[in-house]
Amino acid sequence: MPRPLIATIDIAALRSNLALAKARAPHSKAWAVVKANAYGHGLERGMRGFAAADGLGLIELDAAARLRELGWNKRILLLEGFFDASDTKLLAEHRLDTVIHCEEQLLMLEQAKLRTQIDVHLKLNSGMNRLGFTPARYRAAYERLRAIPAVRHISFVTHFANAEDPDNPVLPVQEQVRRFKEATRDLPGEKSLANSATDLLHPAAAADWIRPGIMLYGATPGAQSAEQFGLRAAMSLHSEIIGVQHIVAGDAVGYGSAFVATAPMTIGVVACGYADGYPRHAPSGTPVIVDGVKTRMVGRVSMDMITVDLTPVAKPRIGSKVTLWGASLPIDEVANAAGTVGYELMCGLAPRVQIVEVN
C-alpha cells in the first residue's frame, strides 16, 4: 500500500477559476499562465483545465513544444522570450509567440533566418526594473522589430510590481499604467498589462489581454482571501495520522526539542515532510485539519513527517484524515503562517507525492 499522502487536482476548479478571471475582464482575451508545470498542478492538467483560454503563457520552451504534442492548437506565449539564437527556429516550428525584453533577444531575432512569421510582444520596463526596455529605448526597439521580415504582429506588454498592494506609495499601479500608455501612444497593436492581482483589484487595467496566473489555481497574490473572490482551490494535500503519542507538561516534541508541552497533550505524527514540499520553516501553530477539526502543527518539520496537536480532536487514531491545505484550509493561510506564499507551496510539491485528479 502506498504512503497515505495524496495531492488531489480539481480540474473543474481550474475551469471555474478561469471563467471567473475572464468574467472580471469581459472585453479582454486571456493568456492562462501554466509556467512551472502549471504551478505544480501538471502541464497536461492545466491545458485541459484551461481549454477555454485564448492562449497559454509559460517560460519553458520544451514545455511549449510539449503543449503542441498534447494537441494545444491555440496561441502559446513565451513570457521570458528565448535564450539562445538556436531557439528562434523553434519559435516558427511550434508557432510560438515570444516576448522580446532586451537588446540581445532583439539582435538574435534580427539575425535569424526564419521562413515563417512569428508574433512578438515587446516588453516595457515600466518601473519594476526586472525585464523590459526602458521608456527611452522602447520606440527604437519597436522600429527595429517592424523592420524584421519574420515579425508579423507586434504587441505590447508590461508587468506590475505592486498590483496586489493598492496602497504601495513607491510604485503604484496607476503610475506604471501612465508610463505604459505614454510609451505605447499611437502604436498599433494589442496590449497586455494585467496579472492576477490586476484582474482582481484593478480591472480597469485589463486592456486587450489579461495574464492570470495564481488566481487560476485558487489562491491570491495579496492579503485578500480567495474565497472573497469566489476562487476555488484546485490543489488539496491530504495525509493521515501514522503515529500517536501522549505527553505531559515538560515533554518536548521533535528535532531540537523545539516544542515543549505546557500541559498534557496528544500528539499525532503525519506522513508529510519537507521532502514532500511542506515548508520546512513552518513554525509551531501552522494550521492543519484532522478529522474535520482545525488544529496546529507543533515542533519542527522533518523530512518525511510533521507532528500536530491532536488534543482538540475527539477520537484521534492512526488513520485519522489530515488536510494540509485545500478547499477546507486555504493554501494562502498555510503559506502566511509559514512566512511564504501559496505559489511556493504549489510549485514545491515533490514528485514522490501521489496525484489524483477529481472532476
Swiss-Prot record:
Positions with a binding annotation for substrate = 130, 303
Q: Does the keyword Isomerase apply?
A: yes
Broad enzyme group: isomerase
* Pathways involved: Amino-acid biosynthesis; D-alanine biosynthesis; D-alanine from L-alanine: step 1/1
The reaction(s) annotated as catalysed by this protein in its Swiss-Prot or TrEMBL entry are: L-alanine = D-alanine
Q: What are its cofactors?
A: pyridoxal 5'-phosphate
| Modification type N6-(pyridoxal phosphate)lysine: residues | 35
Q: For this protein, what is the EC number?
A: 5.1.1.1
Q: Name one GO cellular component term.
A: cytosol
Alphabetized SMART domains for the sequence = Ala_racemase_C
Q: What Pfam family is a match for this entry?
A: Ala_racemase_C
Q: Which InterPro entries match?
A: Ala_racemase (IPR000821), Ala_racemase/Decarboxylase_C (IPR009006), Ala_racemase_C (IPR011079), Ala_racemase_N (IPR001608), Ala_racemase_pyridoxalP-BS (IPR020622), PLP-binding_barrel (IPR029066)
GO function terms (MF aspect): alanine racemase activity; pyridoxal phosphate binding
Enumerate the UniProt keywords alphabetically.
Isomerase, Pyridoxal phosphate
Please explain the role this protein plays, according to its UniProt record: Catalyzes the interconversion of L-alanine and D-alanine. May also act on other amino acids.
Question: Which protein are we looking at?
Answer: Alanine racemase
Source organism = Janthinobacterium sp. (strain Marseille) (Minibacterium massiliensis)
